[in-house]
Structures are given as structure tokens and as C-alpha cells.
Amino acid sequence: LLNGIQWLIALPFGIGSFIMGAFYAPTVVAGVHHMYTIIDLGQLSKFGVTYWLPLASAANIAQGGATLAVALKTKDQKIKSMAVPSALSACMGITEPAIFGVNLRFGKPFVMGCIGGAFGALFASVTGLGATGTGVTGIFGILLCLNNPVSYILMFVIAFGAAFVLTWLFGYKDTNVSEKTESVEAVGDKSTTEK
């Protein structure tokens, strides 16, 4: 499996990286994402940098972007109070609160986060972004990419921005609020009719 992933991310034009950027978050859901440390260590030993870590970072950041879109779009205070810190946590590389607490709960935000991660990973691959160490992703991952910080920041913006915009436009509808509004309108119409 790991050899297959190594082969995949080595495909030209960032094709494999795009795929792995999309599928990284599902491996977090499955709980097997720590296996990628072997890829990091292998690439560090062979090339002096790891090209895998930026892909994982893009995927994590994107889930944060999707979660923040939900946080800003919802009027449900319970969801908002959970989504805001979860988005920040994801941007620091810890995605479980965002994925399990928000994005998977609503489904589409998770998918939009995967798409955002794919585009961020594609950019990282095309620009040859590599990290000089392993162990930290998200905002603090830039400390491992000081050889090319501008590309890391652009990758962050692309992954986060794509996931945020896609979730805002297509990935989340504040259904609870809509249902309450429709319910109030229905009661109002009924009262008017009875009068």
C-alpha cells in the first residue's frame, strides 16, 4: 500500500498528489493516517525533504476551511460554538474535531474539504514543495518549509479558500433555521386563514 502511494505521488503534473490530497481525510476517518510517517521518513532519508507532508497539510487545512464556512453560515449557536474552535484546530493540523464534529455530520462539507485538499496538494506538487522534517502540519508546518515559505502560504490559501468557497456555495445549507422559518410562516398563514 505504501509503495503504491509513493508511486502515486510521483506521477507527473501532480496527478497523484491531487488524488492523495483528496483521499487523505478519509484515511483520517479510518484511523490509518499515521502510516504515512513511513513515507515522510523514507523521503527525508532519500531526498533530504518530504514531499508528502505538504500534501497532508493541504488536506488538513482544507477541512478547516470547510468547517469555518459552516461556522460562519450557520445561525445555530451550538453548531457555531463547536465549528469555530474545530476550524482553528484543523488549521493547526488536528482535524478530528472538524471532521467528526462538523464536516462528516453534514456530509457535503467533508467532501468539499477533500476537494480543497486536492487542489492544495496539486499546487504543492507542481511547485515541488518539500518539508525538511515531519511531525507537524497546518499553520505550524511552515516551519518545516522555510526553504519555500511563499509556496507553503499559497498552498494554504488555495486549500483553505477552495474548501471554504465550495462549502459556502454548495456544501452547507442551514436547514434547521430554514425549517424553523418555514414552520413559523406556516403557523402565521394558518392563523390568518382562521381569522
Give short role names for the model-derived ranges.
Residues L1, M35-T37, L166:
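Juxtamembrane interface elements at the cytosolic ends of transmembrane helices
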Residues G4-L8, P12, A30-H34, F47, ...:
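Membrane-interface elements of multi-pass transporters and channels
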